[in-house]
């Protein structure tokens, strides 16, 4: 088990989160501010400060240790550790006086999954007019099927660099420029434009910067594959995280009629540089050209074929855990104050230098679950329940693409 640590600094922000669920008597939360510049007013109920004292570092550390214990095997979706985690959360909420919050009167909202294990080729070959390049699985690239089918075959597809792969009308940004990329493999930068605070959200990542958006945008454009260029600054994590997160069984929601690329992949920036040079181009120059609204897709002068098999595991599931504390005011009890964190992690994967193959996920996200449960304990210590109902929503399969959050927002049927 990888070591974990707790810090008392976590406690103080939690006091604000507890206060967010409390309004003083006589305040229905609907009063108008005195002007557009007036900050929102937050007032603690009389006993909120005392109730908050149940939140302490020792309690947080204990809950994190339990959730990150080897016995939960990394909390991978649709595993025994996943079920044990959900049981732990439900029991903790019940001890705090919360009631089951799912529509059927249980603690759990099912999240249907399809498991996909892609068996990628050891070498992926690319050809230019005059040369050939092979990228090694694991060291240079990580790939997966983009479709819920047992076989994928792509034949002699052209590679096209599409900058960030973003179409955002509200930002006057379109990397595709209506260029026909049907049947092609698209190569794109990670994240979204972040060098200018007036572009997108500056350094804050929007959905446009997420890997799932990029694969979706490529599919809508008719591409057969999409490759994201990884850099540690743009991703916020090293390529090792890609290696451990995007290998083994991957989970998705059951496919609908939405367009999908047949191949999703990541490459290191070093491998991307070799791909660019194979076609007589320079990666740094391509990246620089993408830093403009005037960017247009660029052929890499490279083509590739790839074929692989996948194991498709249909009919599996995980679940969101929902606990609700009914509000005390009949006129406001139908309104919800929601606290949320995801309860899943990466499960069991490649063995590290110490022989450990369990990805315990203390920070990601046992700490978040412990935070929500600590707030629940504080609510249970209040002498009078909040006027609005409080929902503790512990979502599943975040690591697989926000699947639990999507399931809840598609069907927010709590209480």
Give residue ranges: language-model regions.
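Noncatalytic luminal/extracellular "stalk/propeptide" segments of secretory-pathway proteins
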Residues: 73-197, 299-302, 307-309, 313, ...
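Extracellular/luminal Protease-associated
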Residues: 135-255, 259-263, 326, 334, ...
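C-terminal motif of bacterial Sec signal peptides marking the signal peptidase cleavage site
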Residues: 18-21
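Acidic/histidine-rich catalytic neighborhood of metal-dependent amide-processing enzymes
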Residues: 204-209, 213, 217, 234, ...
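Metal-dependent peptidase/peptidase-like ectodomains
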Residues: 135-140, 151-152, 177, 253-284, ...
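Long, well-ordered, tryptophan-enriched scaffold segments
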Residues: 220-233, 237, 245-246, 251-320
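Bacterial N-terminal signal peptides that target proteins for export
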Residues: 2-12
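N-terminal hydrophobic or amphipathic helices/low-complexity stretches enriched
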Residues: 25-102, 123, 334
């Amino acid at each position: 088990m990888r070591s974990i640590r707790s810090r008392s600094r976590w406690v103080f922000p939690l006091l604000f989160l507890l206060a967010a669920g409390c309004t003083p008597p006589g305040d229905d939360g609907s009063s108008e501010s005195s002007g557009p510049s007036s900050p929102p007013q937050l007032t603690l109920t009389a006993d909120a400060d005392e109730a908050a004292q149940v939140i302490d570092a020792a309690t947080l550390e204990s809950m994190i240790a339990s959730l990150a214990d080897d016995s939960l095997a990394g909390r991978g979706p649709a595993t025994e550790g996943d079920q044990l985690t959900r049981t732990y959360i439900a029991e903790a909420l019940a001890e705090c006086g919360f009631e089951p919050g799912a529509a059927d009167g249980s603690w759990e909202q099912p999240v249907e999954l399809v498991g996909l294990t892609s068996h990628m080729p050891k070498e992926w070959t690319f050809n230019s007019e005059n040369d050939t390049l092979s990228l090694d699985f694991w060291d240079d690239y990580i790939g997966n099927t983009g479709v819920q089918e047992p076989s994928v075959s792509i034949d002699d597809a052209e590679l096209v660099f599409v900058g960030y792969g973003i179409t955002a009308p509200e930002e006057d940004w379109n990397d595709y420029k209506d260029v026909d990329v049907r049947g092609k493999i698209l190569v794109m930068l990670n994240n979204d434009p972040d060098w200018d605070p007036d572009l997108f959200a500056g350094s804050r990542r929007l959905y446009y910067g997420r890997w799932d958006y990029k694969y979706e945008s490529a599919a809508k454009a008719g591409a057969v594959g999409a490759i994201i260029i990884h850099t540690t600054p743009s991703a916020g994590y090293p390529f090792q995280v890609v290696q451990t997160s995007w290998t083994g069984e991957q989970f998705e929601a059951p496919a609908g009629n939405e367009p999908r690329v047949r191949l999703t992949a990541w490459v290191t920036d070093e491998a991307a540089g070799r791909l660019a040079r194979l076609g007589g181009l320079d990666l740094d120059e391509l990246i620089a050209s993408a830093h403009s609204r005037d960017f247009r897709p660029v052929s890499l002068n490279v083509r590739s074929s790839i074929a692989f098999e996948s194991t498709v595991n249909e009919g599996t599931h995980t679940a969101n855990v929902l606990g609700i504390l009914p509000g005390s005011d009949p006129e406001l009890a139908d309104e919800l104050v929601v606290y949320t964190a995801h309860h899943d992690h990466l499960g069991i994967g490649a063995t590290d230098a110490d022989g450990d193959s369990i990805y315990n996920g203390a920070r990601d996200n046992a700490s978040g679950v412990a935070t929500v449960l600590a707030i629940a304990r504080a609510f249970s210590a209040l002498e009078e329940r909040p006027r609005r109902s409080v929902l503790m929503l512990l979502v599943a399969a975040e690591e697989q693409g926000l699947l639990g959050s999507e399931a809840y927002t598609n069907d927010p049927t709590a209480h």
